[in-house]
């Protein structure tokens, strides 16, 4: 599954953005601004929230060390803040420190055992670590929380994780549920199309990827490559060549174009 399910990167990004959205803020970071100069609220909880919001912004920009500094400040003000521990888990996971990431997620769940967002994040971390049965448990727990409102996101991540584990039937079922709830999401459509291709459901796979490629802003080298692989299997050679032309015109430096030109359609 080297370049198939390449959309997993899309999922990781989308999951991260969704988590950061929970840390919504009106604080703006500029290059010249020193966040230490931000006036600190007197209330410890409010002070922790401000620092956590800044941490989320820095994490979203890839400034992991600065994000960790802000999380440390937030936890100094409010040590039992589950969101701070959860975000710290995401930061450590993105840095490749699995031990500290897991410690942070577990601490967050200890403080807030019914927090679906943390279960989702921990589940995705476990999937990245190829601990698929444990990841499945966390996704199911998140979906079972009555107050959890991000089920579509979790179904998407769960479906991708099931595909990574080679559980194609379950993955199709899970991704189909996610698609039914959010049919406009191109990430879900892409992954569902990929899984259907794997299962030999070529016409159905073609349906979903065509929905993506019919919207100019959603077209990527990955979606064109997926369409090319499907149409080649179907024997639609005119469509196959059209996908190749689009790859050359729109994504001339993409790895997918190189694979196309070398005829490596089964990778």
How does the language model describe each region?
Residues 28-39, 214-267:
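Terminal, low-structured helical/coil segments at or just beyond the last alpha-helical repeat
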